[in-house]
């Protein structure tokens, strides 16, 4: 009996100590929900095959917030591919067209901005006025929703303009998506024939150049890893990110994380999303 116990002790000594390991992705999400006192929706999808690798509340509705800007610029690029729009076309606007948080567009009242520059501002700096100007070119919220239906997304909906679309009222279906629908739509835009190869590269590059996502998954990204992303935020308890990730500077997976109905501060929301991202990456590397 003593020999048996010694064998068990010796065997246990060779096993990795779980207390030193980061939580598994789903364990981290459950922990995040507890600490946030809110809901988390997440999906991890293989970019090439579309296979779901990890999911939590993936079919639940969450406010899109500024993550919709990726889909918006996808719709703009589809119009470019169809010959109905040009990235070089200049759009002029007035002071009354500006809304809160327009760090790029507010500097170009005198000279205007091209469609391509507006997309870059909307994605890389989350410029709200740039998004509204682009939204007008695709038929407004109804036009963008119609585009989504055309590419097979029957869930995601945009109902309002910036900045009202960030209201994020509990239980409100307006301006929402699900992690699963957003991931599938992003995959269609970047891998299918919905966009030309040139437009796919352009959309991805705008996401690579994102300059306002530092505190989220980028903060835990290992050296040499690829990331292209777009974040969203609301003052009413919501936060989100859509991202493409992969080692060896290659996009291999889509990760979508949304938070809703949390009283946590923005810094706490950022920290929880970073923690979920870190758990996904560590699990990936095993």
From Swiss-Prot:
A Pfam family reported for this protein in Swiss-Prot or TrEMBL: Beta-lactamase2
Listed name of the protein: Beta-lactamase SHV-34
NCBIfam families in the record: bla_class_A, SHV, SHV_LEN_OKP
List the catalytic residues.
66, 164
Q: Show the GO MF annotations.
A: beta-lactamase activity
Query: What are the disulfide bonds?
Result: 73-119
Gene coding for it: bla
Q: What does this protein do?
A: Hydrolyzes ceftazidime and cefotaxime.
Family listed: Belongs to the class-A beta-lactamase family.
Native source organism of the sequence: Escherichia coli
Under catalytic activity, the entry for this protein gives: a beta-lactam + H2O = a substituted beta-amino acid
Q: Which sites bind substrate? A: 230-232
Print the keywords alphabetically. Antibiotic resistance, Disulfide bond, Hydrolase, Plasmid, Signal
Per the UniProt entry, the Enzyme Commission number(s) are 3.5.2.6
């Amino acid at each position: 009996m003593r020999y048996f116990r010694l064998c068990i002790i010796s065997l246990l000594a060779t096993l990795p100590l779980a207390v030193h390991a980061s939580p598994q992705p789903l364990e981290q999400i459950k922990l995040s929900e507890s600490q946030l006192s809110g809901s988390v929706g997440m999906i991890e999808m293989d970019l090439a095959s579309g296979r779901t690798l990890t999911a939590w509340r993936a079919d639940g509705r969450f406010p899109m917030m500024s993550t919709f800007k990726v889909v918006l610029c996808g719709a703009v690029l589809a119009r470019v591919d169809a010959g109905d729009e040009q990235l070089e076309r200049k759009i002029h606007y007035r002071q009354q067209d500006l809304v809160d948080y327009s760090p790029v567009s507010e500097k170009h009242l005198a000279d205007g901005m091209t469609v391509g520059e507006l997309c870059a501002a909307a994605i890389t700096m989350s410029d709200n006025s740039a998004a509204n100007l682009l939204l007008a070119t695709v038929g407004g919220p109804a036009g963008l929703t119609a585009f989504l239906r055309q590419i097979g997304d029957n869930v995601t909906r945009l109902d309002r303009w910036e900045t009202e679309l960030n209201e994020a009222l509990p239980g409100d279906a307006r301006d929402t998506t699900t992690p699963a629908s957003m991931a599938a739509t992003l995959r269609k835009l970047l891998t299918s024939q919905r966009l030309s190869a040139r437009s796919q590269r352009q959309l991805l590059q705008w996401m690579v150049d994102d300059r306002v996502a530092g505190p989220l998954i980028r903060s835990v990204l290992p050296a040499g890893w690829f990331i292209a992303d777009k974040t969203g935020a609301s003052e009413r308890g919501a936060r989100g990110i859509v991202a493409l990730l992969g080692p060896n500077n290659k996009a291999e997976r889509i990760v979508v994380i949304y938070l809703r109905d949390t009283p946590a501060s923005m810094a706490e929301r950022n920290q929880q999303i970073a923690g979920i991202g870190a758990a996904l990456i560590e699990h990936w590397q095993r």
